[in-house]
């Protein structure tokens, strides 16, 4: 039987103790991080109630198996399926979604490297650069970058997208980007998987659009609220709206029945006046008193104003329809012209 070095046994034991001490256990790939950014990340993780421990993949695997068996957590052992690259164990009190967001927010820009794939579109902005005239101008122009010399400096004529997200950096483009001081890459801890309460989360699950989910929750709340109000289901959130709805319904019934209260009297009188004016319109003018004539005149003026407003709205709609028809005719003409 091969002898196992004491330091390996000790390392596995320490890793196992870390895993036992925190509710959330994550695997991260640290292989892309230089030493200094990695030390900064360690500090940030400590400040946010967590610890990062980098070790050999085989020792991490042994530690996870050990804890899974000791605590009777078979799902935890499945975490070893995600070990790859230069793995490290990150233990924390942050839930998996907050952890993913934390790691994404703390990624840092890095210089261009030939063969590396960019995480997002790379744009060379328009304007003067710090570069002096030289062969780089021709190199830029050969790659479709509109560069020229102005006032003794290389100037970019317009914003130019030189790489789309996911595309590889060529050696020639890497030289240009580095000369311009553009850092198209990112370095950070790459999350491989996270374990919490018997569930393993992968990055694709954790990468959610917060604004979209907040909007969905708001809509769901409003639908539930409206349903609860409509079926008169009282809760601290709906009771006020239910009472208001009941009051308005009761008031409408009372007004319809002519039942006089301090809440209904003005509506009942208003309803009676409208009925009276409707009747007065059918009578000869010489039998009406002056007050009734004034009311009828005021009502007529309001009606005329409403009709004029409706005509304006109809005219605007007709103009819009004419514009749309003209556009359709123009498109039809072009189609006929070009077959």
Swiss-Prot record:
One of its GO terms (molecular function) is structural constituent of ribosome. Part of the 50S ribosomal subunit. Forms part of the ribosomal stalk which helps the ribosome interact with GTP-bound translation factors. Forms a heptameric L10(L12)2(L12)2(L12)2 complex, where L10 forms an elongated spine to which the L12 dimers bind in a sequential fashion. This is Large ribosomal subunit protein uL10. Keywords: Ribonucleoprotein, Ribosomal protein, RNA-binding, rRNA-binding. GO terms for cellular component: cytosolic large ribosomal subunit. Residues 319-330 have a biased composition (Acidic residues). Belongs to the universal ribosomal protein uL10 family. The keyword RNA-binding applies. Gene3D superfamilies: 3.30.70.1730, 3.90.105.20, 6.10.140.760. HAMAP family: Ribosomal_uL10_arch. Residues 307-339 are annotated as: Disordered. NCBIfam families: PRK04019.1-2 (NF003096), PRK04019.1-5 (NF003098). One of its GO terms (biological process) is ribosomal large subunit assembly. InterPro entries: Ribosomal_protein_uL10 (IPR050323), Ribosomal_uL10 (IPR001790), Ribosomal_uL10-like_insert (IPR040637), Ribosomal_uL10-like_insert_sf (IPR043164), Ribosomal_uL10-like_sf (IPR043141), Ribosomal_uL10_arc (IPR022909). Forms part of the ribosomal stalk, playing a central role in the interaction of the ribosome with GTP-bound translation factors. Residues 308-318 have a biased composition (Basic and acidic residues). The keyword Hydrolase does not apply. The gene is rpl10. CDD domains: Ribosomal_P0_L10e. It comes from the Archaea. Pfam families: Ribosomal_L10, RL10P_insert.
């Amino acid at each position: 039987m091969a002898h196992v070095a004491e330091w390996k046994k000790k390392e596995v034991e320490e890793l196992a103790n870390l895993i036992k001490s925190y509710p959330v256990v994550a695997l991260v790939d640290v292989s892309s991080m230089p030493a200094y950014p990695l030390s900064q990340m360690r500090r940030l993780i400590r400040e946010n109630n967590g610890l990062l421990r980098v070790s050999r993949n085989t020792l991490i695997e042994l530690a996870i198996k050990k804890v899974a068996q000791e605590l009777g957590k078979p799902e935890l052992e499945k975490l070893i399926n995600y070990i790859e690259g230069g793995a490290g164990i990150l233990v924390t009190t942050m839930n998996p979604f907050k952890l993913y967001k934390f790691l994404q927010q703390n990624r840092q820009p890095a210089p261009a490297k030939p063969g590396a794939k960019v995480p997002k579109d790379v744009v060379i902005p328009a304007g003067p650069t710090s570069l002096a005239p030289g062969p780089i101008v021709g190199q830029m122009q050969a790659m479709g970058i509109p560069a020229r010399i102005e006032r003794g400096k290389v100037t970019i004529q317009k914003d130019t997208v030189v790489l789309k997200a996911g595309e590889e950096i060529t050696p020639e483009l890497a030289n240009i980007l580095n000369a311009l001081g553009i850092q198209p890459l990112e370095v950070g801890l790459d999350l491989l998987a996270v374990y919490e309460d018997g569930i393993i989360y992968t990055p694709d699950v954790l990468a959610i659009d917060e604004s979209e989910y907040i909007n969905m929750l708001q809509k769901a709340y409003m639908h539930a609220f409206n349903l609860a109000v409509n079926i008169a289901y009282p809760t601290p959130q709906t009771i006020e709206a239910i009472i208001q709805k009941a009051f308005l319904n009761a008031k409408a019934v009372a007004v319809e029945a002519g039942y006089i209260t301090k809440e209904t009297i003005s509506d009942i009188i208003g309803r009676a006046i409208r009925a009276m004016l409707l009747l007065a319109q059918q009578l000869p003018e010489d039998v009406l008193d002056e007050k009734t004539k004034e009311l009828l005149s005021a009502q007529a003026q309001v009606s005329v104003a409403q009709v004029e407003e409706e005509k304006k709205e109809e005219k605007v709609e007709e103009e819009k329809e004419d514009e749309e028809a003209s556009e359709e005719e123009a498109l039809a003409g072009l189609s006929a012209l070009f077959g």
